[in-house]
């Protein structure tokens, strides 16, 4: 047994828990890291039969920990599925029933020459219904969330600063989270003295348009920025207080965009250009040539992030008392040129 106990659950869920967590001799509350990715099919991972995409870290979690083969998402779309996890409610009883966005009625503002809404986000979680971070906080945990929120629009009754999250960095709005080179991200940090959830402008990105060839000149890649914030938060944990980390990484949904590094290059050499994507300006999805290589690269990049989280826990000496859980919010998507049938990403009902 590895020092962590990993659990993977169906639609791709996996977890690892340390031996100390299972020991009656120790009353120490375990640390918990829940990594929830976005729109990954269970068939995207090698441990669930994927043959073309490299996922060594998640495959190792499955081998050394617990692999689930029967599990169900709360909903086929993002916000209500995440609400089911946060509230413990069936989506038929929960307050959040869909991906309803509030920004269409909001005034607009400019970031460079790019237009954005002054308010973005989804239906708020019911403030009278306790959610998972609040439960953890009441039980003595410090809490950090990095990635997608989708539990309330900016300035609403349900934003990270109002729901017992000590540190947040990522996207308030699930629609904004479809883009990897955004105009802004959101942050709430008690350590930085924030009193509310704020916007953090991507100063380099806003010099270039959201749609067209110049979009590729943007360099502030949100997936990496969010991951680095998560690692920095984890690096601050010293074992004196139990921690709950909710890493809601946006990979592999939705636009097929990422740095043209060794991960992507390896898949460009592996896959022919047999399917392209023309783009959709209304959705702000740009044209993609290497659709299959781009998607495969996003899965391997996510796997690399998971491996770095596990390595950080070991480096800090926290792996002996930490549970790590990995899952997806729901099944695969087709937006932005994704091709779930090509990779056999899920089964058909």
Predicted regions span which residues?
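Bacterial N-terminal signal peptides that target proteins for export
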Residues: 1-11, 18-19
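A structural signal for short, well-ordered beta-strand segments and their strand-loop junctions
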Residues: 144-146, 246
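Conserved beta-strand->loop/alpha-helix structural units within folded catalytic cores of enzymes
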Residues: 37-39, 135, 139, 146-148, ...
């Amino acid at each position: 047994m590895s020092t962590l106990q990993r659990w993977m659950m169906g639609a791709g869920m996996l977890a690892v828990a340390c031996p100390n967590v299972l020991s009656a001799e120790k009353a120490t509350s375990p640390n918990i890291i829940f990594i929830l990715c976005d729109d990954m099919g269970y068939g995207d991972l090698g441990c669930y039969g994927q043959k073309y995409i490299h996922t060594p870290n998640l495959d190792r979690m499955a081998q050394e920990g617990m692999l689930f083969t029967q599990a169900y998402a709360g909903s086929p779309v993002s916000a209500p599925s995440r609400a089911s996890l946060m509230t413990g409610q069936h989506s038929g009883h929960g307050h959040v029933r869909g991906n309803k966005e509030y920004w269409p009625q909001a005034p607009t503002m400019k970031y460079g020459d790019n237009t954005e809404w002054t308010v973005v986000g989804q239906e708020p979680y019911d403030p009278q219904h306790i959610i998972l971070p609040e439960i953890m906080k009441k039980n003595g945990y410090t809490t950090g969330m990095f990635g997608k929120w989708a539990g309330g629009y900016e300035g609403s009754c349900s934003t990270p600063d109002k729901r017992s999250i000590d540190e947040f960095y990522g996207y308030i709005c699930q629609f904004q989270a479809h883009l990897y080179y955004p105009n802004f991200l959101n942050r709430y940090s008690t350590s930085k003295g924030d009193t509310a959830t704020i916007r953090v402008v991507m100063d380099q990105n806003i010099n270039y348009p959201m749609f067209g060839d110049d979009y590729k000149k943007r360099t502030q890649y949100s997936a990496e920025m969010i991951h680095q914030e998560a690692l920095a938060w984890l690096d601050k944990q010293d074992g004196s207080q139990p921690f709950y980390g909710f890493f809601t990484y946006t990979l592999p949904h939705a636009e097929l965009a990422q740095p043209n590094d060794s991960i992507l290059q390896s898949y460009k050499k592996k896959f022919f250009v047999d399917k392209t994507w023309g783009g959709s300006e209304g959705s702000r999805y740009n044209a993609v040539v290497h659709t299959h290589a781009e998607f495969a690269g996003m899965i391997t990049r996510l796997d690399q992030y998971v491996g770095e989280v596990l390595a950080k826990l070991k480096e800090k000496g926290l792996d002996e008392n930490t549970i790590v859980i990995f899952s997806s919010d729901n099944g695969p998507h087709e937006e932005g040129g994704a091709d779930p049938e090509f990779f056999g990403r899920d089964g058909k009902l």
